[in-house]
């Protein structure tokens, strides 16, 4: 009976769209998934190809703190579908998981491809329509949906498409899309491959690993910073404390009087970085380092300045921007402007840090929308 009462279209066959389809199909509804590309293709590169499904944070308010945009909106969402529910979902789908020490949750297969195949197996009854949706027009008792090839009519629409794929015909406010979770271009290009552990960003009050690349900086800390500072105009400066642990540089100098400064600093940092940090004093013996030089090096360590000139958009995995959260009901994911129209996952102006948080948003909002459609 349900499938005859409702005709449901999901626009976007990414993580949120496919999981929404899973719950709707499970409840007996017929679902049409629109996407010009292969379903779940964006899942394949996640977690470095290993698919970081979620993060082991089980308090919904603490979990929501990992989203620079969307924290309060997600309180209601995560209270309905938490990390516990995500683990139960993937167990149901036949995906076994494990948790790393840093809290990141992965499939035991360490394969995004394996996760994709299992999800698609469970939504095989959906109608996959390989067309791009260009316009949605509200009609009596539903919506006309226009693609690049044809026109369709559905009683319920779920928008689950992200990036710059704007759909015409609706009066929703869409926040412009900007790169998030990307590497940052700097004028430091000689340290490619160097990794510094537990670096503290003084500007953003965050601690994580920092990777130097051929274009500048990357890795977890750079991604978090890029997500927070999406609206900052280039160029801007960042300041880092490279080593927050207590240490006595003068004591190290006294204990190693005949060692070069670069070799002494190599006991704290990777050798190439120690040499870079030492600068013109790299080969000066410790016993010749005076107080002024010592303080100069200490200031570099605890106030390391980097000039940010842009983002490395070729590395882009997540965008900030999307449908304005003020126009979406977080308890149902239904539009406040149009009945029976839902907006989820990648389409929302929500972005999370690295570590499985963006996929958690996809699973949770996909479930909440499906639950609302089922109960409506």
Task: State each model region's role.
Residues 6-33, 369-374:
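N-terminal Rossmann-like FAD-binding beta1-loop-alpha1 element of flavoenzymes
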Residues 11, 45, 155-160, 343:
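Redox-cofactor binding/interface segments in oxidoreductases and associated redox assembly factors
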Residues 25-48:
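Glycine-rich FAD pyrophosphate-binding loop
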Residues 41-127, 132:
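Conserved N-terminal/central alpha/beta ligand/cofactor-binding core
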Residues 162-163, 349-376:
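A conserved FAD-binding loop/helix module that cradles the flavin
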């Amino acid at each position: 009976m349900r499938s005859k009462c409702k005709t449901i279209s999901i626009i976007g066959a990414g993580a949120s769209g496919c999981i929404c389809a899973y719950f709707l199909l499970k409840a007996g509804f017929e679902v049409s998934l629109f996407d010009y590309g292969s379903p779940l293709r964006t899942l394949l590169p996640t977690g470095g190809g290993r698919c970081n499904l979620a993060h082991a944070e089980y308090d919904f308010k603490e979990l929501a703190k990992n989203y620079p945009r969307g924290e309060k909106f997600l309180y209601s969402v995560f209270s309905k579908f938490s990390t516990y529910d995500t683990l139960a979902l993937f167990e149901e789908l036949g995906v076994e998981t494990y948790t790393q020490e840093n809290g990141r949750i992965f499939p035991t297969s360490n394969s995004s491809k394996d996760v994709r195949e299992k999800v698609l197996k469970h939504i095989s009854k959906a109608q996959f329509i390989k067309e791009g949706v260009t316009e949605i027009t509200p009609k009596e008792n539903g919506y006309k949906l226009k693609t690049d090839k044809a026109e369709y009519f559905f009683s319920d629409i779920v928008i689950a498409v992200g990036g710059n794929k704007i759909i015409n015909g609706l009066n929703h406010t869409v926040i412009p899309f900007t790169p998030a979770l990307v590497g940052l271009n700097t004028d430091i290009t000689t340290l490619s491959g160097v990794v510094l552990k537990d670096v503290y960003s003084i500007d953003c009050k965050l601690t994580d690993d920092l990777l130097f690349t051929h274009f500048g900086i990357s890795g977890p800390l750079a991604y978090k910073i890029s997500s927070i500072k999406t609206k900052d105009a280039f160029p801007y400066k960042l300041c880092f404390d490279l080593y927050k642990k207590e240490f006595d540089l003068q004591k190290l100098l006294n204990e190693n009087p005949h060692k070069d400064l670069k070799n002494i600093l190599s006991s704290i940092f990777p050798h190439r970085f120690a040499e870079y940090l030492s600068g013109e004093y790299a080969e000066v013996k410790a016993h010749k380092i005076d107080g002024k030089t010592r303080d100069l090096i200490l200031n570099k360590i605890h106030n390391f300045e980097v000039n940010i000139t842009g983002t490395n958009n070729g590395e882009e995995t997540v965008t900030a921007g999307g449908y304005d959260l003020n126009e979406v009901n977080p308890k149902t994911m239904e539009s406040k402007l149009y009945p029976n129209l839902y907006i989820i996952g990648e389409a929302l102006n929500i972005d999370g840090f690295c570590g499985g948080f963006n996929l958690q948003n996809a699973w949770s909002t996909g479930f909440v929308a499906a639950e609302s459609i089922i109960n409506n």
